[in-house]
Amino acid sequence: MKPIVCRRINGTQDKEDQKMATLKKGDQAPSFSLVDQEGKEVKLSDFKGKKVLLYFYPKANTSGCTKQACSVRDARSEFQHLEIAALGVSPDGVDAQKKFDRKHSLAFPLLSDPDHKVAELCGAWGEKKMYGKSFMGIVRSSFLIDETGKIMGAWYKIKPENTVPEAKKVLGK
């Protein structure tokens, strides 16, 4: 798989450059490898032949991220029937991911992306504003990836409660 590369012009980064590459329907998902909450290496290629719901969330155990993760957990039996694997990604460390998983009985891989490289590849890292301040962080995003690694649906700035319904909509469910 050919990874998507985000470039900086002349080694600088201004407001225009902060717009990361975004994925859209039909694009090849970038290949990646991250560590999950159990310390196990997980690669997107491990799921070849299955659909994958890949979603990015800002911080484990916050209200929106908990709502999003629990909605994915609650769709587990339906996802199993549809042969969809779920992968959550955040900049949190492995220990924080493990606590999040245990606290909410999520039982699907939560991947640690502390240097946000995978988030950048997917366009899920960008400028955010809170209380009048600008900073870089995770843009809550989700992607439905088909069995061959192609994007079936991409949602940026998705509301936590819409992650599962939007994925199901693409599948006609």
For the regions a language model picked out, list residue spans one by one.
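Chalcogenol-based redox active-site neighborhoods
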Residues: 3-6, 16-173
